Amino acid sequence: LETSRQIIRQMYANREAFLLLLTKSQGSRFENCLDEVVDISEQQYRRLCDMVTNATGRPRVDDYMTHWMAHIMVDTFVHLFLHETEERVALKHVDALTMYLVRGWMGIMTES
């Protein structure tokens, strides 16, 4: 949960830069920055899922699902940031959103 709060704090501490990246970067070298964050997240999730598979013997979570879960995670933070103008409001909601994401991951990794 603390990592999610830190992400929100950093986004709001650099609000103008994040707004430019998220809403005005088309045509610049930064226009695919969200896809790059998703790719990094997807690689991390792939490693995590493979570790769970190796440790438990459960079936491997497929790449399609890993990709979508990475997208959902990134999109959650972007949506919260773009729709809440005040950091305190975003911080009020980020824990519940993070727990929702974590529980979804746990469900996928334990039911695959």
Name the predicted role of every residue range.
Residues 2, 38, 95-99:
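Well-ordered, non-membrane alpha-helical segments in soluble/globular domains
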Residues 13, 43-50, 66-112:
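C-terminal peripheral helix-coil segments that are non-catalytic and often amphipathic
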Residues 27, 35, 57, 104-107:
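Residue-identity detector for glycine
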